[in-house]
Amino acid sequence: MPTILTQADIQQVLGELKGWAWERDALEKTYRFGSFREAMSFMVRAAFEAEALNHHPEWANVYDRVTVRLATHDAGGKVTAKDVELARRFEKISWVG
């Protein structure tokens, strides 16, 4: 089972990840894009990143917004290093449109 991050670990990570929050025991962020097409482009690329890590987000799309929620199912739905790595990868591709 992956190691669950402590509250202190999570607060440190949130200081590094712009716009992310700790909500309901998960890392969460809503991205806003210029159009539905840009939002879908991000989701497709994000899906490839998730597959590469074999770690998948909970997410939703409404027009130009994508809300991402990251927690590790194997760790009882808590935040682990896998979630942090995926959030960092999403940040690197979030400019994509």
Curated annotation (Swiss-Prot):
Broad enzyme group: lyase
UniProt-listed InterPro entries: PCD_sf, Pterin_deHydtase
Single Gene Ontology BP annotation: tetrahydrobiopterin biosynthetic process
Residues spanning the membrane: none
UniProt keyword list: Lyase
Documented EC number(s): 4.2.1.96
Reactions catalysed according to its record: (4aS,6R)-4a-hydroxy-L-erythro-5,6,7,8-tetrahydrobiopterin = (6R)-L-erythro-6,7-dihydrobiopterin + H2O
Alphabetical list of Pfam families matching this protein: Pterin_4a (PF01329)
GO MF term set: 4-alpha-hydroxytetrahydrobiopterin dehydratase activity
UniProt xrefs under HAMAP family: Pterin_4_alpha
Similarity remark: Belongs to the pterin-4-alpha-carbinolamine dehydratase family.
Protein name stated in the entry: Putative pterin-4-alpha-carbinolamine dehydratase
Native source species: Opitutus terrae (strain DSM 11246 / JCM 15787 / PB90-1)
